[in-house]
């Protein structure tokens, strides 16, 4: 019994440490965060579960927010700098009526349970420096041309980016997957807490921290590399080219 108690306490301690590391890497991480994204979503009414034959509709919503976009709904999200000025959203009529944009957050005005159909979101073409994806979802960033790019995955979502950015900051808390191999960057700073994966190709420098079993694959080897790994995480260097 004493052994079982020690094991249980060790497990609890490890969980607390992991949560603390995740919060240190990305202060926005909150284990109680739901699709509302405010940390207290359990206090609000639930959405009605959409029927299987609920018709899809498309809505256009005015964008309210600055240079940070936070996605708190399960969705496939597309962004291009040449998109229009509004958020275009498609999905089941039963759910779309609850969709809101508040201070750069795309979320629902109710709690959603038992919903396995993703929404489709097309973000406005204004410049965003930061993209935050909470929970599940697919974030597609195309034809970027910007100085700074900050991407945070909290949960099990994934992101793919193409284009150019001078400086990339990538935070993954959970099991997210980031494909940045087709994004041309000078320098990158990557923080992974959990089992997340990332592929990237920084030309000049990379600062890497992994807590857990995360994995980073370099498609192009940076000239300057700084690493710290706590756990079973690993870094796969770019293959060397023979002369």
Residue ranges of each PLM-predicted region?
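Intrinsically disordered, low-complexity terminal regions
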Residues: 1-154, 158-163, 167-173, 177-182, ...
């Amino acid at each position: 019994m004493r052994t079982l108690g020690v094991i249980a306490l060790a497990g609890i301690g490890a969980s607390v440490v992991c949560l603390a590391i995740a919060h240190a890497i990305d202060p926005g991480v909150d284990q109680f965060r739901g699709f509302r994204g405010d940390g207290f979503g359990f206090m609000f009414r639930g959405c009605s579960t959409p029927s299987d034959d609920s018709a899809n509709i498309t809505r256009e919503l005015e964008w309210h927010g600055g240079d940070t976009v936070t996605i708190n709904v399960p969705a496939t999200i597309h962004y291009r700098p040449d998109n229009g000025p509004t958020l275009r959203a498609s999905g089941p009529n039963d759910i779309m009526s609850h969709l809101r944009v508040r201070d750069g957050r795309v979320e629902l005005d109710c709690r959603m349970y038992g919903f396995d159909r993703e929404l489709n979101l097309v973000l406005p073409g204004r410049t965003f420096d930061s993209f935050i994806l909470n929970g599940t979802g697919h974030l597609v960033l195309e034809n970027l041309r910007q100085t700074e790019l900050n991407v945070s995955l909290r949960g099990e979502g994934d992101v793919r980016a193409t284009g150019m950015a001078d400086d990339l900051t990538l935070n993954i808390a959970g099991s997210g997957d980031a494909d940045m191999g087709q994004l041309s960057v000078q320098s990158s700073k990557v923080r992974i807490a959990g089992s997340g994966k990332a592929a990237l190709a920084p030309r000049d420098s990379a600062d890497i921290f992994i807590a857990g079993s995360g994995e980073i694959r370099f498609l192009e080897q940076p000239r300057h590399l700084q690493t710290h790994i706590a756990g079973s995480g690993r870094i796969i260097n770019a293959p060397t080219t023979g002369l």
